[in-house]
């Protein structure tokens, strides 16, 4: 399933799940309106803004400090787009765990899709906690419909025998 990133709550949950899955201890900031991304690489470049931000200070590795924040900005069409420098991303904790910006965006998309399904498919009717990882690394979210429980009046009476007894006053 390929979708556009339009739901900020699902994007936030997807990013948080992806970071946790790869043991990247980073906070995802949410800003509305968009706020400026930090850039320690080129102070002369025009500032970039994003609505969801992973600060560079959370993306350092033992061998290198990250130079740029990673963000997602809502564009004029209402979808979120990745704002990241591919070179810096490949060097930081995200790149070390996931890969380049294309691979990162693909992984975000998978977690976003899972978050959308979990938001829209009622957990009272559907069990969606099982995620299968296939041989090729693809993730599959398995949805199974929960059985609908039917409780008869007889079962209610046996559970609480006095619940259905009414006394009539003379």
Per-region residue spans from a language model:
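Interaction-mediating elements
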Residues: 1-170
């Amino acid at each position: 399933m390929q979708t556009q990133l339009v739901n900020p709550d699902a994007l936030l949950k997807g990013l948080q799940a992806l970071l946790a899955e790869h043991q990247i201890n980073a906070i995802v900031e949410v800003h509305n309106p968009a706020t400026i991304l930090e850039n320690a690489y080129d102070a002369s470049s025009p500032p970039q803004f994003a609505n969801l931000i992973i600060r560079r200070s959370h993306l350092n590795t033992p061998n290198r400090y990250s130079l740029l924040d990673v963000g997602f900005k809502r564009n004029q069409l209402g979808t979120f787009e990745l704002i990241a420098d591919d070179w810096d991303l490949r060097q930081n904790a995200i790149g070390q765990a996931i890969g380049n910006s294309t691979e990162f965006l693909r992984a975000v998309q998978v977690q976003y899709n899972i978050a959308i399904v979990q938001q829209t498919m009622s957990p009272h009717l559907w069990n969606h906690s099982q995620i299968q990882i296939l041989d090729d690394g693809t993730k599959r979210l398995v949805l199974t419909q929960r059985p609908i429980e039917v409780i008869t009046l007889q079962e209610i009476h046996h559970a609480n025998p006095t619940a259905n007894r009414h006394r009539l006053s003379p």
